[in-house]
């Protein structure tokens, strides 16, 4: 039996990734009984999703990376999309390189991911060139997310903004409601649907059902982060009831 330490750098008011990522990885135990995972987090202060707090939070990510590397993680992920996307197109590359170097300077060689980078990498790996998205954000921030994705050469056909500004309230949204929201989303002709383009908006209970409902791959921030974590750990990318990309299928791109 081998134990993998999963590290997350999270906004202080977030709880969802620390719920959904353990749920997915522990759901693997029946199929992969030789695996065990432990879960560890370091927090960046953030209560409201605004430019000032996002910038301060991004700076704090360096401290968090050092703290997690002290405990010798197997892999770590910067689990916030908008903190990175708000800094400008392609910023996940800058952030990941900086955090990777910070960890290396602490004497640790481990993969350092970000949820923003994992989104871009996963869409490209699977050849998804057109998507539609659901976010909890106010419309200007949803546009920033869509623009970031489009700057990577992936078209965002449609988006729904739930317009919940309080980050704690986002974490309390009912994932079952996403099954109704997705009916309002224009997903004709898209390659995939992003059911939750936010690490704090719960979606895991709805992922597989939404995919079955619309007949297209359905992803979320937690799902694509787990996919990239498993890849970087050299493990099979399979999680039950977590959608197409975690079904063990190999990318076509």
From Swiss-Prot:
Transmembrane intervals: none
Miscellaneous comment text of the record: Reaction is initiated by nucleophilic attack of cysteine at the double bond, yielding a covalent succinylcysteine-like intermediate.
UniProt name for this protein: Maleate isomerase
GO biological process, one term: protein homotetramerization
Listed Pfam families: Amdase (PF17645)
A single MF term (Gene Ontology): maleate isomerase activity
Effect the entry attributes to changing residue 198 to S: Loss of activity
Record's catalysed reaction(s): maleate = fumarate
Modified residues (S-(2-succinyl)cysteine): 80
Lineage: Bacteria, Pseudomonadati, Pseudomonadota, Betaproteobacteria, Burkholderiales
Sequence positions that bind substrate: 14, 80-82, 137, 167, 199-200
Residue numbers annotated as active site: 80, 198
Domain of life of the organism encoding this protein: Bacteria
Family that this chain belongs to: Belongs to the maleate isomerase family.
Isomerase as UniProt keyword: yes
Keywords: Isomerase
Effect of residue 80 to S: Loss of activity
Complex formation: Homodimer.
Gene3D superfamilies the UniProt entry points to: 3.40.50.12500
Task performed by this protein: Catalyzes cis-trans isomerization of the C2-C3 double bond in maleate to yield fumarate.
EC number: 5.2.1.1
